[in-house]
């Protein structure tokens, strides 16, 4: 991971997956397991939580509907249940800039190279190692590193 720029990698992944029906990917991702404590934290603090994912809106629609929180995604034009064209690749740092311009304090949780700039701009950044180790690039700029769901939730409660 991290050997090629995120945008190039993302375009290649979308191209590979474009052979599959969008509805099938959406259904499969809609069944992905969620961290129960994090889900409960989001539900209790819904007005202060936002998801920023580089994934395509048409792929993560069902997953995001389960979480039921404001979200920002990449987008694509879909034709005959297949990706016809990527129309926007989310730059997560733009989401951070938007909320900071509104006067909000931004706590950003990420783990990948594509999170680095957003984490750098956030008021507080948290590198997550809940699923896999964070990219080396984010370790140099993060304020906190968490390995367990309970630890992340305790930290978020302290920061709120």
Please give the residue ranges for each predicted region.
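A metal-dependent, Asp-based hydrolase signature
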Residues: 1-44, 61
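C-terminal cap/substrate-recognition subdomain and adjoining C-terminal extension
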Residues: 35-160
């Amino acid at each position: 991971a991290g050997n090629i720029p995120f945008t190039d990698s993302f375009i290649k992944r979308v191209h590979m997956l474009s052979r599959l029906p969008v509805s099938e990917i959406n259904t499969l991702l809609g069944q992905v397991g969620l961290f129960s404590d994090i889900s409960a934290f989001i539900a209790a603090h819904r007005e202060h939580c936002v998801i920023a994912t580089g994934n395509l809106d048409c792929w993560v629609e069902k997953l995001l509907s389960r979480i039921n929180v404001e979200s920002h995604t990449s987008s694509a034009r879909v034709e005959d249940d297949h990706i016809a064209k990527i129309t926007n690749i989310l730059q997560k740092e733009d989401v951070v800039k938007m909320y900071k311009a509104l006067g909000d304090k931004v706590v950003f949780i990420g783990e990948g190279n594509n999170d680095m700039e957003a984490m750098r701009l956030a008021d507080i950044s948290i590198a997550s190692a809940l699923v896999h180790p964070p990219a080396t690039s984010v370790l140099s700029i993060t304020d906190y590193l968490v390995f367990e769901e309970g630890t992340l939730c305790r930290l978020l409660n302290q920061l709120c």
